[in-house]
Amino acid sequence: MKVDKLKSALSNYPTGIVCVFSKTKGFYNAIIVNSFTSVSLNPPIVSWCLDKKSSKFKVFKNCKNQTIVILSNKQKKFANHIAFHRDKVSDLEFNKILKMSICDLYCAIFKKIKIGDHFTFFLKIKKISGIKKIKPLVYYKKKFLTI
């Protein structure tokens, strides 16, 4: 099957957007993800997938902890910036991002599985912070949209 055809078909399904962070060498490495999903409530496990060819693959594959930030409709500019221009943020920027997000999940790596051309990360949620009643940022037809 052609990858472009598959991507086109799957782009018809709207998904939520998260930013995954992992801190190394004083900075937060960041990646925008639409493959985030809940896996288990007890224990609390979530997952997301990363292409092995991604420039960010090595950083996330080797980390022990990750923070999942569920992005709000006020973070479209930030999502585009991370997705297309930048992959690291400072402590100050990270804290500003958290203030605008819907909520933050502080996680430890539970399991990593190689599937095809991707790795799936299973994360155990250790702490949930900042649940706010604001609308999410979504991804549909290859664009970030707000509801």
Regions found by a protein language model. Give the residues of each.
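Basic, polyanion-binding surface patches
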Residues: 1-147
